[in-house]
Amino acid sequence: MANAAKTITVEQTASAIRRHHSQRATLIGLKLNKIGRTAELQDTPEVRGMISKVQHLVRIVDEK
């Protein structure tokens, strides 16, 4: 059986209003656009970097 890819669930906790356009674009890249929305993403270094860029706007809900 192939190794299952690890996933990470993130939730948007703050608004993107009055944020830099690059932070808004990062949220869109994380499949988030409204407060309270969650997205399940693959746990890769790229995704971790995106999360760290907007860590004041999101929280990690679950890591599998």
Curated annotation (Swiss-Prot):
MF GO annotations: structural constituent of ribosome
Annotated GO biological process: translation
Keyword Phosphoprotein assigned: no
GO terms for cellular component: cytosolic large ribosomal subunit
The keyword Ribosomal protein belongs to this UniProt entry's keyword annotation: yes
Keywords for this protein: Ribonucleoprotein, Ribosomal protein
Family stated for the protein in its record: Belongs to the universal ribosomal protein uL30 family.
Subunit structure: Part of the 50S ribosomal subunit.
HAMAP family, sorted: Ribosomal_uL30_B (MF_01371_B)
Protein name: Large ribosomal subunit protein uL30
